[in-house]
Amino acid sequence: MKDLRMVFKSRITNIHFVGIAGSGMSGIAEVLHNLGYGVSGSDISQNKITDRLKEMGCQIYYKHHQDNIKNAQAVVISSAIKDNNPEVIKAHQLNIPIVPRAEMLAELMRFRFGIAIAGTHGKTTTTSIITHILNMAELDPTYIIGGILNSSGINAKLGESDYLIAEADESDASFLHLQSMLSVITNIDHEHMATYNNDYQKLKDAFVSFSANLPFYGTCIICIDDKGVNEILSDIHRPIITYGFNNGADIQAINIKQVDMQMHFDIIYDKYTKPFPIKLNLIGKHNILNTLAAIGICCELNIKVNIIQKALANFSGVARRLDYHGKLNINNLQISLFDDYGHHPKEISAVFESLKDTYQNKRLVVIFQPHRYSRTHDLFDNFTRILSTADALILLDIYPAQEKPIAHINSSTLADAIRKYSSLNPVVIKNQKKILDILPNIVHNNDVLLTLGAGDIHTLPELLKFNYT
């Protein structure tokens, strides 16, 4: 397989990333650095990701300035970067190629055996499980994941083999750049609708186009349990393997039970003469579906069942996906702390179900930070319904993610709607540190406390552990 460096290394030696700390950007930056490119990048604040990249030898700037790109022959941007960014403006003036993140990922994948995982929910976990199994099989893949693997503390690595595993992002339709050999569609849901002119059919059509990027001998592995996926099934004209709990699935999970913090089930797949058992070191039925997708990929790669079984039994998960942070001691009350990235009602529902199944007869106390005004507006009724099922709820202000406010869409109006819908009385706060003042008055002994959201709430578990352990 031709090395990417041989293709344009003579022309492109230094690559600059605008917004390098983004989950999709940092992984590509790390792989390119390990391929031998000079990598620089800018972001508005220092964090663990920028620290890691700096330790590797990347040049990191903590503000956006035109001088940051002085040595670059290409500038990589994510969809979050606006045209008025000074580095983008300077790149235009100097006629430096401006490369969308997904186009750079596609360039990496073009010279490898690509495995692309798409879907509204479950991409990161599914990608991580596939990566873990391939590593256990000693296939040494390159991988670029939107979350941090708990086992290694990283989200990207340059492998020695031709395999490249990556998430395929539908949020800005950039997954249409990717041309893989194998692909997964986990589900299709109403999310990032502005990209598709608020037309759900256009979103579904994009997933059909994603599947069409496979070669005629490629395979698309899809969840037959999902309504949105079923609606495009007849439009996919590539070999298909289906998975799910449904009796009609090619790969089906049966005999499901939870044992402590594991899911145990059997796999039926007609490639094998009899069912084989799985012990998954994660909780939640949604994670069984993610695992079925991963099994489909790994069976296509002829990975032995015993390796798949061993890998799933010791998979340690992904940061901020039902991440257990241990016990808190709040005024001598013992509280189990979990953290999750969930920010869509369907994701939140899956997390709630998983924790309630695991901690039956215990209260679920939730601290939720809504993410984006547009999402809160579009899914307001669904948020109201799902959040009402918590036993206690603290709402932080909406994390805007560069969006402008929408009239009457805020955490206070969401709290009012929840009060009207149910008997729950949410507490609304503007400052995370205020949680330390009110939490002792909310929790009971043996409660399960969940911090939830895709914004800066990710810093809250450490604050809680610092003060309550």
From Swiss-Prot:
The keyword Iron does not apply. It catalyses: UDP-N-acetyl-alpha-D-muramate + L-alanine + ATP = UDP-N-acetyl-alpha-D-muramoyl-L-alanine + ADP + phosphate + H(+). ATP binds at G119, T120, H121, G122, K123, T124, T125. GO terms for molecular function: ATP binding; UDP-N-acetylmuramate-L-alanine ligase activity. Pathway: Cell wall biogenesis; peptidoglycan biosynthesis. Its EC number is 6.3.2.8. It holds the Pfam family Mur_ligase_C. It is found in: Cytoplasm. PANTHER family: UDP-N-ACETYLMURAMATE--L-ALANINE LIGASE, UDP-N-ACETYLMURAMATE--L-ALANINE LIGASE-RELATED. Belongs to the MurCDEF family. This is UDP-N-acetylmuramate--L-alanine ligase. It comes from Vesicomyosocius okutanii subsp. Calyptogena okutanii (strain HA). The gene is murC.
